[in-house]
């Protein structure tokens, strides 16, 4: 691509959006290069990028072009193509959703769109419930406010496969961003009936499916749990509080500053429940209210973070791994106790999620399926079970990045489901005088202590992209040890190991049941390092983990 020529073409043609036109005129040479050095990547996760002017940005033109490519793909593969659309609270999410709807309508693709912002799992659900050909969710999940994205689902409600993404990308690449995109007015589409709002019955059906995930099976528990909840200025407020209240959890305090949708995320610039800064305000509320449980969902409400009180009365944040294995153990224990465990039960987790999950699953007679990073691969496996007539065999799926799913009603992680099941689990143990931290200690005593940590390193711009590629190649060198732990084996998933799709992921198996995984993020300009350390206790594990991190960071030079 001739960057200068493309920039000038945008100056001449990108006039419909005043903000884009104005920004183009302010760009210096360095910013022009970053905005135009490539087209925004379209993959299994759809689009994700910084909002702004240029081919490497999220704007009405890149969204419209992607929508045109998807429309062309749908028309080739479906006799009567249709799409379900949703959007979150991010800056321009509603605008991008309506632009996409207008493009689909102009191409004869029937559009069903949520009338208000909704969690991402409701798009997966609506796609399945309404039997649409595809689903689109405008979101950038837990990224900072400058980002937005465009997530695509297949007819099964699962994020598109690698093959489908390649076919859609091929259609997109045929298009000129200004000359080849058909558009239509959103409001005119609603009036004509080409664009229809998704009815409330679909939302109610979604909430009912979440409620059906309960594993109490008639057992009585004390539901008077003091809960502090934060939707982190996203989409979770109504569905999470509605579900909890309908199931008897009414003692809920919502973090006021983070209650209403706001794509600027004024109280937490990085609205990710994985990081303590995003949970800080909720922790303050929990202390003031003397809450039993703190819950927070990310802006598109597919991740859940929690905090509980320890014996000293101080609040502790639990990791996604810890919450996931607690939920897995609780669900399995309840199913076994009540005779509700299905035939040939299955648990699905990602390769970067703690291996203790597999030990717990084995204890209860579950088969574990390990998949690549990304909940779409968990959804894909649920789909395979469904095709075999065995959807009920699926018991639980989770990933270390705070994503959980207890049923097959959607094919993506569900923060509404996660929030509800965490509350139920908390109440169940509290009724017996057991805290979640007590239960966690019990699991460590049974299966051995394991520390799992995640370290992220940011690399912005075109230079950063090249740097990440260089670092990944450096890690493929003949590394003998990390932190004094010998490398027993290197698993390079770029070769498609264990029947999994090829992926830019390296996993070093170290001695003493330790490991380190290195991969670039699929949604942000970051390299991620996942470390797992088995040891006698937390102190010993933290010491080893620190040494492994030091050695790993040497390869960033």
Please report, for each region that a protein language model flagged, where it lies by residue:
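Short Gly/Thr/Asp-enriched flexible loops that form oxyanion-binding sites at enzyme active sites
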Residues: 95-104, 147-153, 302-321, 357-360
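Short glycine-rich or small-residue beta-strand-to-loop segments that form or flank ligand, phosphate
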Residues: 82-88, 226-229, 405, 532
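Conserved phosphate/anionic-ligand binding catalytic regions in large, soluble enzymes, centered on
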Residues: 36-56, 140-141, 227, 231-243, ...
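Glycine-rich phosphate-binding loop plus the immediately following alpha-helix
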Residues: 153-183, 321-344, 349-358, 427
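An N-terminal, well-structured beta->alpha segment
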Residues: 2-100, 107, 188-190, 195-224, ...
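Phosphate-binding and adjacent anionic-ligand microenvironments
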Residues: 287, 291-293, 314-316, 334-519, ...
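N-terminal small/polar loop signature for handling phosphorylated ligands or for N-terminal nucleophile
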Residues: 84-147, 246-305
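Gly/Ser/Thr-enriched, mixed-charge loops and adjacent short helices
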Residues: 31-36, 40, 148-280, 284-286
